[in-house]
Amino acid sequence: MKRMLISLILLLATLFLLGAKTVQVPGPQGSLSCLIRLPEGFNPNTERCPMVILMHGIFSSKDLNPMPALAKGLAEAGIASVRFDFDGHGKSDGRMQDMTVEREIADAMAVLDFVKGLPYVSEIGFLGHSQGGVVASMTAGRLAKEGKDVPKGMVLIAPGSVIKEACQGGKFFNARFDPKDPPEFVRCWGFMKLGREYLLGTQALDIYGTASAYDGKVCILHGTRDGIVPIWCSERFKETYGESAEFILIEGGNHMITRHRKEVVQRTTAFFKSVF
């Protein structure tokens, strides 16, 4: 117990020194666990800075890379970030089995409303990885269609729009199912549950049509050795956004960009510095 207490104190001290703060944001499905990271030396009481909302992929969390590395790089560039766990993921409320893309869009909207209420935030950007890229793009598109303020810029890393085709084909990772009548849930890798509502609802998503309403600047990054999300997903997003988007292939990069993280962080920070 004593060792655990010491470890907790050290962790909290480290987060404080790094300008990080954990907050709970009320979401449609329950509490969303968020981690705010501010630039080193930044005083939120007297200064203002831009903030990027980071959205992780399916079966991931705010604490798994590439999210922490991106938050660190942004902070070093003078840009704040908030990364959060979608409902049913990480430390947020809810069950993985109940997760849907529409619910994740609602989560993103809730975090956006929270960020808009922070007095030290000057401008807002979106970043999404994998399914988080789908959520980020559709959230930005919904905001535009509703005539609301949209993010100043957006980075999509291996945006996983292939989830629609996967659900339509009855094959999601190693799970097999009848796409017209899926079971209550399927298991991916034996322990990750995807519910019937996700398997049916994802088939009907108008991903690119919704995303197309956003006309801000977009940076799309995709590893050439991504074995999970095919490159054509990013190519479709590039076609959707046209001249307002730049599409960059990360040579040799896999889906999690494990060996090319420095390049991804550098390109991400350079993009946001150019739009803020």
Where are these regions (language model features)?
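N-terminal cap/lid segment of alpha/beta-hydrolase-fold proteins
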Residues: 18-45
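The alpha/beta-hydrolase serine catalytic core
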Residues: 32, 134, 139-141, 145-236, ...
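Short beta-strand element of the alpha/beta-hydrolase
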Residues: 47-57
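Short beta-to-alpha linker loops that shape the active-site pocket of alpha/beta-hydrolase fold enzymes
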Residues: 58, 85-95, 160, 253
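Catalytic nucleophile-loop/oxyanion-hole region of alpha/beta-hydrolase
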Residues: 62-63, 89-119
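Conserved alpha/beta-hydrolase
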Residues: 71-93
